[in-house]
Design a protein with these regions (language model features):
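Positively charged, low-complexity intrinsically disordered leader regions
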Residues: 1-6, 278-284
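N-terminal glycine-rich phosphate-binding loop and ensuing alpha1 helix
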Residues: 2-79, 139-140
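Residues at the starts of beta-strands that form the adenosine-phosphate
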Residues: 5, 50-52, 97, 124, ...
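Cofactor-binding loop segments of dinucleotide-utilizing enzymes, especially the Rossmann-like FAD-
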Residues: 11, 56-57, 130, 159-160, ...
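Residue-level signal for inorganic ion chemistry
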Residues: 37, 63, 116, 131, ...
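Conserved beta-loop-beta/alpha segment of the NTase-like Rossmann-fold superfamily
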Residues: 73-75, 86-174, 218
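Catalytic-core segments of class I nucleotidyltransferases/pyrophosphorylases
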Residues: 126, 145-149, 177-280
Length: 290
């Protein structure tokens, strides 16, 4: 199976980061020298994705503008002798074929994915959640794509989390080991109680699914919060066809909340060629007075 297409859901309101997100989409908040969503698009491209659909909503037009060409800006930069900056601006629009679709109604992640059925067609596809940034040597989505292609099945990213977190995520039941850090999935449930959980392995923001999910989502009833939950659809999918979990290598940041966003800023800045050295020294000096 060849994975060429990806969906990035970016229709959320970003209420956990208000007032920042009152007028700026949370996906456009800066993470060192690029907006959050650019890192996600770059991860998709590095995993071999050729076409990307970003699911948006009212107030998200800055995302569309960002991935479009800006000829006036490029011309001005070149005129001012800033050729490198002009090339950087153009490179954003050249990264991949990026398309946009409005969710229109906030009916949950499952509904947002179902809206993309025409874009996907009959191909396997990837999902990268717009809040989740990954820091890893091999892109996390590439780890999933390889597992999906090796095992000819859907693949989802998982990580073991403590009890206080598993109740906030989806818990998966792991069965036989299929490869290095790859397991067959037997079942899953959305935000379980501690008595309901299958394990402490949580689904974290990256998926490769077969197009069979669309027929399932079309009849999936609203679940928690009266929304169509992607996990409910995947639960049915994994009962009807093989699905695997990838205990991915790397670190995940939830940039949709202040703690995760600030942690990502620090870690990505420390790895930045321009900022890393002086920031490291700045932190050392600051730490003396903490």
């Amino acid at each position: 199976m060849k994975v060429r297409k990806a969906i990035i859901p970016a229709a959320g309101l970003g209420t956990r980061l208000l007032p920042n997100t009152k007028s700026i989409p949370k996906e456009m908040l800066p993470l060192v020298d690029k907006p959050v969503i650019q890192y996600i698009v770059e991860e998709a491209v590095a995993a071999g994705i050729e076409e990307i659909l970003i699911i948006t909503n009212r107030g998200k037009s800055p995302i569309e503008d960002y991935f479009d060409y800006a000829p006036d800006l490029e011309e001005r930069l070149v005129k001012d002798g800033k050729q490198s900056e002009a090339e950087t601006v153009r490179a954003v629009a050249d990264m991949a074929d990026v398309f946009f679709l409005r969710q229109k109604e906030t009916k949950g992640l499952g509904h947002a994915i179902w809206r993309a059925k025409t874009f996907v067609g009959d191909e396997p596809f990837a999902i990268l959640l717009g809040d989740d940034i990954m820091l890893s040597e091999k892109p996390v989505l590439k780890q999933l794509v390889e597992a999906a292609e090796d095992n000819s099945c859907s693949a989802i990213a998982v990580r073991e989390v403590p009890d206080e977190l598993i109740v906030k995520y989806s818990s998966v039941k792991l069965e036989e080991k299929l490869g290095d850090r790859v397991y067959r999935i037997g079942d899953m449930n959305e935000k379980p109680t501690l008595d309901e959980k299958f394990s402490n392995y949580a689904i974290l923001g990256r998926y490769v699914l077969t197009p069979g999910i669309f027929d399932i989502l079309a009849h999936t009833a609203p679940g928690r919060n009266n929304e169509i939950q992607l996990t409910d659809g995947m639960k049915e999918l994994c009962h009807g066809e093989p699905m695997c979990a990838v205990d991915f290598e790397g670190r995940r940041y939830d940039t949709g909340n202040l703690k995760g966003y600030l942690e990502a800023i620090i870690d990505f800045a420390l790895k930045n060629q321009e900022a890393g050295d002086w920031l490291r020294e700045f932190i050392r000096e600051k730490a003396k007075n903490l």
